[in-house]
């Protein structure tokens, strides 16, 4: 098998597929509150295009898929997309990232279709604040979604917490306590200068050393734990006596570019080899032309930088506010 390897020796076996750029929320770090223009439906990859693409990609070593958005559960055919991917025997793991507003309703069908596990965005445990950060989200719906995911066996459940200075950094302790009684993995993620967030990221950025300082301040003893299924770049820890774990993902202050094994496919059919690099290849016209398609995929990988620009900003102490041109919801979270 010919593997998808870049010039730095990194083998790519994981792809994140955005199935829509639309979302029912407007999280402050992801999308502006208004003035948005979304892709017309005919510009969005169809279920058959996604499945056909993956039937080819597995022949080159891709074996893990994460479905993202926008909010992927807005797709009326999301269960059929999962079912189509689940029918490809070479795919070992299918996961989804969701805001969980519709997860309680769809978790069972998704599990039956072949979904392996779920990541849930949850940036506050206080209902009013959660509603403010998401501009309309209902915390109880997320909690119901978590419970349903547990019931149907989507495991491990991971909660993604974007740490925002002055908005939710006083909840670190609450999130840590959340792991004591629940077998979940809470992942604290640095605020990144992507798209809409790029205009204000310096003011809202908080280094993740804050997490460990919070543990020390309240006397929580913690230890590193072995890899969690699908843990990716997260460094994981467990508070003594806790059922669950917590992790830190620091793409800004301590990048993990040297071990990056992922590609991204946008909802409109562009391959991106690096989240923070604007270069991308339009592969949609060649979905049914495997030779040409794989040439474009390999070209994107060949052009992949050794490190992303966020790392360079900190190394050079520039920390400019220049964002990428696509919003996170357009790239795929």
UniProtKB/Swiss-Prot annotation:
Reaction it catalyzes: GTP + AH2 + S-adenosyl-L-methionine = (8S)-3',8-cyclo-7,8-dihydroguanosine 5'-triphosphate + 5'-deoxyadenosine + L-methionine + A + H(+)
Residues involved in [4Fe-4S] cluster 2 binding: 257, 260, 274
Gene3D superfamilies: Aldolase class I (3.20.20.70)
EC number: 4.1.99.22
Pathway connected to this protein: Cofactor biosynthesis; molybdopterin biosynthesis
Cofactor note: Binds 2 [4Fe-4S] clusters. Binds 1 [4Fe-4S] cluster coordinated with 3 cysteines and an exchangeable S-adenosyl-L-methionine and 1 [4Fe-4S] cluster coordinated with 3 cysteines and the GTP-derived substrate.
SMART domains cross-referenced by the UniProt entry: Elp3
PANTHER family, per database record: MOLYBDENUM COFACTOR BIOSYNTHESIS PROTEIN 1, MOLYBDOPTERIN COFACTOR SYNTHESIS PROTEIN A
Disulfide bridges in this chain: none
Keywords of the record: 4Fe-4S, GTP-binding, Iron, Iron-sulfur, Lyase, Metal-binding, Molybdenum cofactor biosynthesis, Nucleotide-binding, S-adenosyl-L-methionine
Binding site for S-adenosyl-L-methionine: 29, 70, 121, 192
Biological function: Catalyzes the cyclization of GTP to (8S)-3',8-cyclo-7,8-dihydroguanosine 5'-triphosphate.
Keyword Zinc-finger assigned: no
Protein name listed in UniProt: GTP 3',8-cyclase
The organism's place on the tree of life at top rank: Bacteria
InterPro entries: Aldolase_TIM, Elp3/MiaA/NifB-like_rSAM, MoaA, MoaA_NifB_PqqE_Fe-S-bd_CS, MoaA_twitch, MoCo_biosynth_MoaA/MoaC, rSAM
GO molecular function: 4 iron, 4 sulfur cluster binding; cyclic pyranopterin monophosphate synthase activity; GTP 3',8'-cyclase activity; GTP binding; metal ion binding; S-adenosyl-L-methionine binding
Residues at which GTP binds: 16, 66, 97, 158, 262-264
Top EC group: lyase
Keyword NADP included in the entry's annotation: no
Subunit structure: Monomer and homodimer.
Pfam families, per database record: Mob_synth_C, Radical_SAM
Gene Ontology terms: biological process: Mo-molybdopterin cofactor biosynthetic process
Residues involved in [4Fe-4S] cluster 1 binding: 23, 27, 30
Domain Radical SAM core as annotated: residue spans: 7-221
Cofactor: [4Fe-4S] cluster
